[in-house]
Amino acid sequence: SIVGTWESINLNPTVIIYRSDKEYLLSIIYVSETTKQASPSTYEIQKDGSQYFIAPAPKRIYIDYDPAKDVLNLSSLGDYLRN
């Protein structure tokens, strides 16, 4: 299961994936450099054929998961390891 907290290996924002009713949600936790305040942006995980994605503007971010390595990949943010 990809549910959980994921840390970027490229120092991108932390990602949390969780289930709400019948859908899965992905929150990207942005932390302000100046105020150190965390502000999440939450998106519903959608499916297109066999691909999963979230759709923040301006383009989709595709989600790939390697269960053997337990590595999550977000198309524009790189690899994430389970925290």
Question: Could you describe each region identified by the protein language model?
Answer:
Residues 40-68:
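Mid-chain, structured segments of secreted extracytoplasmic proteins
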Residues 11-49:
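N-terminal glycine/threonine-rich, aromatic-flanked beta-hairpin/loop signature
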Residues 6-8, 27-30, 50-57, 74:
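Short beta-strand segments that buttress and anchor functional surface loops
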Residues 11-14, 59-61, 78:
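Short acidic/polar mixed-charge low-complexity motifs
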Residues 73-83:
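Edge beta-strand at a domain terminus
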Residues 33-36, 61-63, 81-82:
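A short local loop/turn or secondary-structure capping micro-motif enriched for an aromatic residue
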Residues 1-14:
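Tryptophan-anchored aromatic micro-motifs
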